[in-house]
Curated annotation (Swiss-Prot):
This is Deoxyribose-phosphate aldolase. The lineage of its organism: Bacteria, Pseudomonadati, Pseudomonadota, Gammaproteobacteria, Pasteurellales. The active site is at D101, K166, K200. GO terms for molecular function: deoxyribose-phosphate aldolase activity. The gene is deoC. HAMAP family: DeoC_type2. Its main location: cytoplasm. It catalyses: 2-deoxy-D-ribose 5-phosphate = D-glyceraldehyde 3-phosphate + acetaldehyde.
Length: 258
């Protein structure tokens, strides 16, 4: 597959993201506008819950209402208070989110507690399922670090009802890596849930070349046809600029951002 071909696919799989403390309505509107490209639109935009209504309005105004709106809960620290995570998820759904990316209580798992993670995901899933909202679970691979813990967090999340497992918040020193992605994709394969569980690489995927490596990895493990927006996403902001440069046949630009 050529770089242009993989860049076009990667664009269609993006959750175009802004999750900054200084986000404003204007920045969210600009994000939505950036997602309307001559090469198509991303799968979703991802914003903080309070910006979901403004994103909905912006997407509709520009004729791209097919773009989903994702948001985050229990973010970014993955605290182990189930009630707060559930309350935040209920609020996110009430704001009108199509998808919720909840942070798994990874520190509890690192301390040996598997139950909190299971219950938190299970209860958030119940909230989402009642409103036909997709639930992605961020396991924070760069903090879990070991293959054993990454696999365990993936398994717990899947068994508790996750629709997607996601590498990272983008708020810690180490985010998505191909090594971590392989463990998560192989867990989806080994549990025989590829028909109902997807994978999202977030943070650290910045170039068309890097995106192509993730696509190739997913195709190797789960098959060519599996890689579509129902099963695979990139969480990114700066990646879009680079993909558009590749699609326009320009040399890669150095970009900063998530």
């Amino acid at each position: 597959m050529s770089l242009k071909d993989s860049a076009k696919i990667a664009l269609s799989l993006m959750d175009l993201t802004t999750l900054n403390d200084n986000d404003t309505d204007e920045k969210v509107i600009t994000l939505c506008q950036q997602g309307k490209t001559e090469f198509g639109t991303p799968a979703a935009v991802c914003v903080y819950p309070r910006f979901v209504p403004i994103a909905r309005k912006a997407l509709k105004a520009q004729g791209t209402e097919q773009v989903k709106i994702a948001t985050v809960t229990n973010f970014p620290h993955g605290n182990n208070d189930i009630d707060i995570a559930v309350a935040e998820t209920k609020a996110a759904v009430a704001y009108g989110a199509d998808e919720v990316d909840v942070v798994f209580p990874y520190k509890a798992l690192m301390a040996g507690n598997e139950q909190i993670g299971f219950e938190l995901v299970q209860q958030c899933k119940a909230v989402c399922q009642a409103s036909n909202v997709l639930l992605k679970v961020i396991i924070e691979t760069g903090e879990l670090k070991t293959a054993e813990l990454i696999r365990k967090a993936s398994e717990i999340s899947i068994k508790a009802g996750a629709d997607f497992i996601k590498t990272s918040t983008g708020k810690v020193p180490v985010n998505a890596t191909l090594e971590y992605a392989r463990i998560m994709l192989e867990t989806i394969r080994d549990l025989n849930v590829a028909d109902r569980v997807g994978f999202k690489a977030a943070g650290g995927v910045k170039t068309a070349e890097e995106a192509a490596q993730y696509l190739a990895l997913a195709q190797e493990i789960l098959g060519h046809d599996w890689v579509n927006s129902d099963h695979f996403r990139f969480g990114a902001s700066s990646l879009l600029t680079n993909l558009l440069a590749a699609l326009n046949g320009q040399a890669n630009q150095k970009v900063s951002g998530y």
